[in-house]
Amino acid sequence: MKFKHLSVTAAVLCALGAALPSFAADAKAEAKVVVIRAGKLVDVVAGTVLKDQTIVITGERITSVGPSASAKVPAGAQMIDLSSQTVLPGLIDMHTHLTSDAYLGGYNALGVSDTRAALYGVRSARKTLEAGFTSVRNVGAGGFGDVALRDAINEGDFIGPRMSTAGYAIGIQGGHCDENLLPADKNVVGRGVADGPWEARAKVREMAKYGADVIKICASGGVLSKGNEPGAQQYTLEEMQAIVGEAHKLGRKVAAHAHGASSIRDAILAGVDSVEHSSLIDEEGIKLAREKGTYLVMDIYNDDFILQEGEKAGMLPESIAKEKVIGQLQRDNFRKAFTGGAKMAFGSDSGVYPHGDNAKQFAYMIKYGMTSMQAIQAATINAADLLGWKDRVGSISVGKFADIIAVKGDPAENAAELTKVSFVMKGGEVIRR
């Protein structure tokens, strides 16, 4: 019966295949054409700002970009006048937790089911997209809530950014990625816990099985977890090599949460694709990152929120105390890493602070060493490269998705203008105007 079913299915598919050319032709003929007149356009590839540009969009993708004076506008196209604004590619945040709520820190989180958290994600996704972030990498969520959210957005059920998802973050028992808030008699162990190289390999396979696009690991302790020091290494080099080897074999990149110098060094030596936080990175770590081409994703805005709102948000007293020690060091080391030649991608750790405020980080990236253009590039072409999506997003280029935003000011002069996004388009559809 199985083979009979397959043969019938094959026959149906063949019949459909014969009709596909006409379907494709009809779809192409009916694709909506939109034309954007841009007063200024940020060319993130060249690092320049172009004046009086016209962008032609057919369906989801960009089909033409060039000077307005010579642009050919298709008959019947929908016109969008942004001639008084600056247009740039949709932004990308490489470190989000869309299913987390900033005001449910510490023990408050124990009252939230994974299902409820996934519903927070629906709200957070919309806020993030409306803020101009058209793609995100979500690096940890319970119950594979981020995977479900990604799929729902892709299927058109909800509005949100393009998502690369990790599922559960993987770490050692008792470490930053474990569940450490409950006492011993409850015997609660986090779903992402894996000790030793072979357990770690198996956990990578599990994450991939259930839909993770990227593998997130905890190489060191953390600020917001109970009972561990941010600078203390947790995974060994051997364990991280096993994780990276398995993940890369399965076509997944690896992001390593690492605050301490030794954990950063071993994560880079193990071959991770990015190091998150990098708070206590030293000269050796910067040199290794530069030589290996490892991206650093440093969240240097949320220190403000933790110190100002952490107690109100329910964060543990020990977490606030740790942040007081590590926050400014991370910002200073951001400058050292950037000037030392390490590749940087924008990542803000949204969910630690309220979603939609992602762009507040730009001001700190500029304060600690970047030009506005370099900060924008970190959130566009650099982030797209780290995602493995350079062919899809990250610049306003022919063939890429029409993920486009606009602001009334000039973000290339002051990237902090990106906190005031006035226009958002994702895949040719206007989300905010």
What do these predicted regions represent?
Residues 111, 249, 318, 324-411:
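His/Asp/Glu-enriched, well-ordered alpha-helical/loop segment
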Residues 102-105, 225-227, 264-270, 300-315, ...:
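Histidine/acidic-residue-rich catalytic or RNA/ligand-binding cores of hydrolases
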Residues 7-21:
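Bacterial N-terminal signal peptides
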Residues 100-117, 126, 173-188, 223-237, ...:
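Active-site gating loops and adjacent loop-to-helix segments of metal-dependent hydrolytic enzymes
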Residues 85-157, 173-176, 180-183, 238, ...:
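Metal-associated gating/positioning segment near the N- to mid-region
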Residues 148, 199-219, 223-295, 325-344:
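Histidine/acidic residue-rich metal-binding segments in metalloenzymes
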Residues 26-30, 41, 46-88:
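Histidine-rich, glycine-flanked metal-binding segment
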Residues 120-146, 160-169, 212-225, 253, ...:
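Divalent metal-dependent hydrolysis catalytic cores, especially in the metallo-beta-lactamase
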